[in-house]
Amino acid sequence: MYFNNELSGLKDRFLKSLLAQKYPDRINFFLWELKFLDCFLHLQNFAFASECGMLDVSQKMLKNFKRMCATFRSIRPNAGSDNAFAYLKEVICKRLCATLLNTRPDACSDDGFAYWNEVIWKTKQEFRAKYSFPKTPLASNKVDDDDINIHSPKFVMEFIDAVVGNLNVLVKINDPCSLLFVPGPKEQIDQVSKELKLLRFFVCFVSNKCIEPQYGHTTFYIHALIEASHIAMVVWLHLPVYGNGNQDLAPSEVSRLLSDFISRNSNYIDVLKALKSTIPQAQNKHAAESGIVETPTHNLMVGLSDQMVNLQEMLCLLRDNLIHLPILDLEFHLQDMDSVILDAGLLIYSLYDIEGEKEDTVLDDMNRALGFDLPRNIEPIKVMVYLVMQKAFQCNLPRVHGLGYVDFLLKNLNDFQGRYSDSLAFLKNQLQVIQTEFESLQPFLKVVIEEPHNKLKTLNEDCATQIIRKAYEVEYVVDACINKVAPHWCLERWLLDIIEEITCIKAKIQEKNTVEDTMKTVITHTSSQLARTPRMNEEIVGFKDVIENLRNRLLNGTKGQDVISIHGMPGLGKTTLANRLYSDRSVVSHFDICAQCCVSQVYSYKELLLALLCDAVGDDSARRKHNENKLADKLRKTLLSRRYLILVDDVWDNSAWDDLRGCFPDANNRSRIILTTRHHEVAKYASVHSDPLHLRMFDEDESWKLLEKKVFGEKRCSSLLLKDVGLRIAKMCEQLPLSIVLVAGILSEMEKEVECWEQVANNLGTHIHNDSRAIVNQSYHVLPCHLKSCFLYFGAFLEDEVIDISRLIRLWISESFIKSSEGRRLEDIAEGYLENLIGRNLVMVTQRADSDGKVKACRLHDVLLDFCKERAAEENFLLWINRDQISTKAVYSHKQHAHLAFTEMDNLVEWSASCSLVGSVLFKNPDSYLYSPAFSISLILLNFKFLKVLDLERQVVIDFIPTELFYLRYLSASIEQNSIPSSISNLWNLETLILKGISAKTLLLPSTIWDMVKLRHLHIPKFSPENDEALLENSARLYDLETISTPYFSSVEHAELILRKTPNLRELICEVECLEYPPQYHVLNFPIRLEILKLYRSKAFKTIPFCISAPNLKYLKLSGFYLDSQYLSETADHLKHLEVLKLCDLEFGDHREWKVSNGMFPQLKILKLEYLSLMKWIVADDAFPNLEQLVLHGCQDLMEIPSCFMDILSLKYIEVDMSNKSVVKSAKNIEETQVEDNQNTNFKLVVIKKMMWKVDVGVNKGRLETFKRLAPLPGIKSVAFDFNKKKLTVTGDMDANEVQLVVSKLRKRGML
């Protein structure tokens, strides 16, 4: 309305005043009155307002305002203006609030509000007696064409909205002491409000149908305005006034209001009949407003309303699905849809014109009275309801699908029919037919994956997409049936149509002979698309001159700190080049400390500091509790007096550099910082001595070498003709490395034929103009359909985020992206998909496992990530909801099965009501802190009833587990409780459960967890299963469970029982209760398929109470135990296939000696020893025959590495860190023998300068400050204390003897 902004500002002024808390009810009452007055002032140009007295009311109240504000002489109407609106706004907003809340202008009273109350009351008494409903014929209420905006439908709807808003205030007030309280039932006011809303819908509907206003429509708008204004006046006059007694709204007035509405239904009917002759106008983005089909049943007779139940149900379904349905999806049905809606409106309003109805009115009598056949008229409505419901679901289905969705549906159909047999009984036959049809199509879907280069690839993928869409629809129909959100006739018809459509798809497949043979026999050969792409040496290609230039800057130049800034456009290889230098051995050996961080466009300052500190001094979980200032100070002190190399990657603006630069002190010791950025301004701003380096483009020779290496690996292109085409393609990439790599990914999947490469060259020729996105789009276009969804899913991750592969694969499986294949694990198939994307150069590997070369972590280039986000949004696949994005229900209310990524939980609350059919909710935030919303996040999540993936990354604390989401397959979050409810078993589809308790207490796992037979991955830090052995014995076995972390086993018997329940376990991380002195080692048989085992102690150093027996174990980590040679020898006898052994923080018995006999650990490839008390290590000549890597960290008591390592021909790498000089010397002797005598050119020795010594000094807390004096001494990096063990730990470059000398001096001085 005209006065809305002023009222809003006035309310803000009231709420900010000191009286807001004292008189909140007065403020609300005052604003309520002004809103009604505003309504009446807007009617001053209409004749009916003057005839019925509304205009007199507004003029009277305006005079009162003027008199109340008479003391403010400075307030005058603008010159030449007698506009009541302008004067009212000026007076009210500037002066009246002060008058009302403080003093009366013409009296000494201290209560201006009491005076205002009295004025209103007298005015209402004066006008109540003489007010009457306007009887003027509608025709006489015409206004001139010049005033068309005043009575436009927009004006009418805004007026109705204002009146409805004031009525809703009365309905909500239940406090008898409130000035706005209306005693007695509120049904009368509520019914008036509903009538007005219905009228408003009708006005909107008419306006949508008629772009050009006609005389009849304008008359109708005036009629609607008269009705609404009459309601406003009656309600205002009869409102109870504080201090004058509560007076209810007169029942007679309410009855008259409703009867007035009903008596004028003939006007609605006339307008609807006129609209039937018009052509539907599609001027709006969405289908027409359907509010007119909301049946106003309060005046329908009981007998009649009972007969209209079915009609009302259909109309509600029509309304609910039409409101936000994009009109483009119904463009061929607009005429039919308009006809149905108009007929429905005529049917409803005609019911009120039947006079003399009796309560025993029957359907036949009603049909005769109306002049038409009700059942026949309802049938078109049923057809339209079904069409609209179907379209509302189909129109925004994602256009990219996971081919594993049919597998998920087929499993669930069996479960649904077993769990909900009663609800699904009437659909049993149809569901059985559908199940059979989908099973018959499984071989075809397998062909689509295994033969992506089939000549009918496009047709195959189109058919596969249609099949998946039908699977989505079946799932929705089944759920709608179970939850009774749609009538049986509609769902039954829908399933019959799905069966018919599947039959058509099969016919199309057979007709084109795409699977003529495979529909009868199953293809058994392994696809090249599932095979792993051979890994090649990831050595950088090109930029040799640039590398040499930058290496010289890092090692030479000024003695002061210097920043080496590298800038250039996306895709040039700035990050690759910087990482190449950062990992260069000749560079790294020059610096004491090396650390790196990636900033990105959106970053967390705290996370950057933590990343740098982790590289500089090691990881420390307690450090996360510190604030940013403390972390920054810690980093600065760590780097002070040390020569450091820092890599700061992907800086977007100067402020990011300002945040970090203070942490890098300049000690004039040739410290260096490498900085990469896209922007020259940032590079120049950060520079100190060296000029920024603008990274050049590739030259033609470098372009071809990179393309050749990416396509052929270590081989060369032998065909001159092929090379000619390749050179042309490389040149077309315009010397941009990213473009070359992406095109190489396309070529590597093609036959090495000139014709194929020519086709790529021709396609690229029309797209490439310094536009990497065009090449990315080409790479995406040639992806097999089963890889497209996997690739676009990367758009759900943050910029520069390092993605854990285990987590990614679990998400892919939960999203049904992975198609099952008989005899193969889904995880193995998913790894093949990933390697395929890596082979196409769409995904960058950041970490591989040392033992088997499998990818452990990856990331996406910024250009590729942006493409994934944009393309995923276009395909209705993934939508990012950012902090400043406004919820638009009209656009996103039906994003069926899409994935939503949120950066703030508040966004989730705003969007939850309009995203009930979303399949995935992913929370992404660069900060790692726990987020505890003030609202019930779990209640919000219940709105997402089709949710299959809920990944809150254990960052968001949920108040309870939403166990009603039975489609859920992946759940990751933090919880407040110390126990998990037994209702967790209601999530019977759950495959991955990742929970973290916010307290340090052990989480209690209910026994019902053993009912979750689909569970594959269970990860809960420090949980304890209910120790009810009888209950566990009788529970089911979890045959699908493959990974568990981190249960607490209180006894060997407890562990045995759990292991029997998980026969197919592959990875186990657990804590065990240890024994002081076990009488003998009990052999604990772990599941035969177990490959990874990590054991941690639960308390202080004690012996493991069992000997490990796991015939196929490949990875073993033991941490925190008391061990001896006997235990390790007995364990080795049961671990013949062990490839990786990590012993961490162990105390050794037997005089701190470890003897390794011949034949022990025959398959071991990696041996890592960290912080052991080991002094003497004796290894037989034939032990560790296949060892490749030996890593020693913090083994400061070890005297030397056994000489037998010189003769292990498979040895490739030794790393020594924080150890004594004797260990370093023995490692160098081994290196010399391996390289010179054994000619092992692949051998590499890495000695890290940091050294650690532990000295027993009898430390007590009172001397803590004394020891801190050690830290600033030259050569000492840090000092740490362990009061329990009475040990001092000094980290630095000093010799151990020098440390002992310092300690001796401190003792002599009485400081120890």
UniProtKB/Swiss-Prot annotation:
One of its GO terms (biological process) is plant-type hypersensitive response. One of its GO terms (cellular component) is membrane. It comes from the Eukaryota. Gene3D superfamilies: 3.30.70.100, Helical domain of apoptotic protease-activating factors (1.10.8.430), P-loop containing nucleotide triphosphate hydrolases (3.40.50.300), Ribonuclease Inhibitor (3.80.10.10), Winged helix-like DNA-binding domain superfamily/Winged helix DNA-binding domain (1.10.10.10). One of its GO terms (molecular function) is ATP binding. ATP binds at G568, M569, P570, G571, L572, G573, K574, T575. Residues 1248-1312 form the HMA domain. LRR repeats lie at residues 944-968, 990-1012, 1087-1111, 1115-1134, 1135-1158, 1161-1183, 1184-1208, 1273-1296. Transmembrane segments: none annotated. Pfam families: LRR_14, NB-ARC, NB-LRR, WH_DRP. It is a peripheral membrane protein. Keywords: ATP-binding, Coiled coil, Cytoplasm, Hypersensitive response, Leucine-rich repeat, Membrane, Nucleotide-binding, Plant defense, Repeat. Residues 521-823 form the NB-ARC domain. It is found in: Cytoplasm; Membrane. Residues 419-442, 535-556 form a coiled coil. The keyword Metal-binding does not apply. Confers resistance to late blight (Phytophthora infestans) races carrying the avirulence gene Avr1. Resistance proteins guard the plant against pathogens that contain an appropriate avirulence protein via an indirect interaction with this avirulence protein. That triggers a defense system including the hypersensitive response, which restricts the pathogen growth. This protein is encoded by the haplotype B genome of the allohexaploid Solanum demissum. PANTHER family: AAA+ ATPASE DOMAIN-CONTAINING PROTEIN, DISEASE RESISTANCE PROTEIN RP. Belongs to the disease resistance NB-LRR family. This is Putative late blight resistance protein homolog R1B-17. It comes from Solanum demissum.
